[in-house]
Amino acid sequence: MEQETIEFSSNAEEYVFSSAELALLLAATGNVRSVGFAMPGTENLEQAAIIQTIHGLLNKGMIEYTEDGGTFHIIDTLADKLQVCGRAKNVFRFVEIADEQIPRMVCYKYSGRCLTIAPCDTLSHGWVIRSATISDIISELQNDGLLPQEDSLELVDKSNEETAAQRECLLEIQCVDCTSEIIVGKVKFVRSSMDDLLEFSGENDLENQVYAYEQKLITDWMEKNSVAKGEL
């Protein structure tokens, strides 16, 4: 039987990291894009491990040397998606998955588009980051019952509504055991860089505590999964 060929959208992007690489990138992406050796959040990493990880990211083309040669620069298309992880106002939904088999390539369709997950053959396991347009994410979260359908959720048109709705942001990161093709963990972003596009009616006094708690959850979850596999 001839295998069906699936054409993926040219706009779809995917990035595969080891746990150490992702931890390094997340630690380096707050409001800045430069990666150096004195990065907040990396105090527990040995300098040799940081250097080795940076070399790996350079080889993958995910970071570049700056012109002055003193630091490294995360490529713009990747930095834009990673920056949402370093912002204060992120809410995450954690889904622990066991024994869930995935094909070598999975096609996710949103409004006629395809987004892909492709485990990296060169890693025993790795992190896969999947992105989608904001309008697609809104639809998915509303379908999951995680965002209201009513008028309390409004897409803010700051410049051009069509452009704003198509702006891409981080949707999901997965930790994949690439040898067995099993998803060993997943973090789903309920709200990320949509902050500048979404407006909620009313105020929640507990909002800041919730954001801080959720951000600690993702940090603890990533550290637990990374340390368990001996990558940090």
Where are these regions (language model features)?
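Non-catalytic recognition/regulatory regions in large multidomain proteins
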Residues: 2-23, 31-39, 64, 71-232
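Basic amphipathic alpha-helical segments that dock to polyanions
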Residues: 49-61
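Short amphipathic alpha-helical segments
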Residues: 46-50, 133
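Short acidic, hydrophobic short linear motifs in intrinsically disordered regions
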Residues: 27-46, 54
